[in-house]
A protein has these predicted regions:
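Cytosolic regulatory modules rich in charged/polar residues
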Residues: 2-23, 29-33, 41-47, 52-60, ...
Length: 268
């Protein structure tokens, strides 16, 4: 059809600008149709929709994509979201998805899956920036320069057994003498979140009054991960958006529903 590209562009624009409403609309369609529709979207648009979609539906979609597509999507999602999706899959489908993710991403997801849903252990970033306390500041600067993240606020200092010993702010790290061992420049004691803490305990933690991120620890204060304040707000926003989905539907109006549903039919 000569004008088919116009409705295609409109459909995917709606997908990009209204991911929550798109997620709720897509949930009403057969899984195979959803996969076909999303396969035509730009890779950066898919993760945002999956984040708001019913976990069972999103996980089923994920399991039907080719391995390369799965790997791209998982790489674009926070580990906590990927973990939640994998929990919704059967064991066979889950292992297939994890295999497609690659060893590094799969390892992160498996670590989160050891903890109950909605606990700090399941919501954390399982790859906190950390170095042993006997390393020096020069080594720490080199390490931090290689960390690929725009949200690094602190370097966590551990004992050689992996237990948390202290914390060092990035600014402090660059003001200290290069030859200083980390145990001399770190701050202690450290505000930390036990891995089995629930959402309410995480949100109410007094450490947020001082720090932009808090380490998550297991038995004997073994460092497991980190939750940043920005991620905490993001988690709460996702929950709030999902809880208030119906009022948002009415705000957007029936025209959105009609438009996206019929555009999907035209594309497929």
């Amino acid at each position: 059809m000569a004008g088919s590209k116009t409705p295609d562009r409109l459909a995917y624009r709606l997908l990009r600008e209204y991911p929550l409403e798109a997620a709720r609309t897509l949930e009403k369609s057969p899984i195979e149709e959803v996969v076909t529709f999303l396969s035509g979207a730009d890779i950066v648009e898919i993760p945002e929709v999956l984040r708001f979609m019913n976990r069972d539906v999103a996980a089923a979609c994920l399991s039907l994509w080719p391995d390369q597509r799965i790997a791209e999507i998982i790489a674009s999602l926070p580990p906590r979201v990927s973990c939640s999706l994998c929990r919704s899959l059967g064991e066979t489908e889950r292992e297939a998805v994890l295999k497609a993710c690659g060893e590094s991403a799969a390892g992160s997801i498996r670590r989160l899956m050891q903890f109950p849903e909605n606990t700090a252990g399941a919501l954390m970033d399982p790859n906190p920036p950390a170095l042993p306390s006997d390393e020096d500041v020069s080594s720490a600067r080199e390490y931090m320069a290689k960390v690929k993240s725009s949200e690094i606020y602190y370097l966590y200092i551990t004992n050689r057994d992996g237990t948390l010993a202290g914390v060092c702010g990035v600014r402090d790290l660059y003001q200290a003498a290069e030859s200083s061992p980390l145990h001399q420049v770190m701050r202690k004691p450290v505000s930390m979140i036990p891995a089995l803490s629930g959402r309410n305990a995480i949100t109410a933690h007094p450490g947020w009054q001082t720090y932009h991120a808090l380490p998550v620890v297991g038995k004997n204060e073994f460092l497991l991960g980190v939750i940043s304040y920005r991620n905490l707000r993001e988690i709460e926003r996702e929950k709030s958006d999902q809880d208030n989905a119906m009022p948002l539907f009415f705000a957007v109006g029936e025209m959105y529903w009609w438009t996206l549903t019929h555009l999907m039919e035209g594309i497929m």
